[in-house]
């Protein structure tokens, strides 16, 4: 349903943000 789609998009966005944060942290080393 719509809610599961919203949750899936949110999870994907959270994963993408975590990856970006990890890349930024590595770049700052």
From Swiss-Prot:
Has antibacterial activity against the Gram-negative bacterium E.coli and the Gram-positive bacterium S.aureus. Has antiprotozoal activity against L.amazonensis. Has antifungal activity. Has no hemolytic activity. The keyword Cell cycle does not apply. The modification Leucine amide is found at residue 29. GO terms for biological process: defense response to bacterium; defense response to fungus; killing of cells of another organism. It comes from Pithecopus hypochondrialis. Keywords: Amidation, Amphibian defense peptide, Antibiotic, Antimicrobial, Fungicide, Secreted. It is found in: Secreted. This is Dermaseptin-H7. One of its GO terms (cellular component) is extracellular region. The primary structure of this peptide is identical to that of Dermaseptin 01 from Pithecopus oreades (AC P83637). Belongs to the frog skin active peptide (FSAP) family. Dermaseptin subfamily. Expressed by the skin glands. It comes from the Eukaryota. The keyword Secreted applies.
């Amino acid at each position: 349903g719509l809610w599961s789609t919203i949750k899936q998009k949110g999870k994907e966005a959270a994963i993408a943000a975590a990856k970006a944060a990890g890349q930024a942290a590595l770049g700052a080393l």
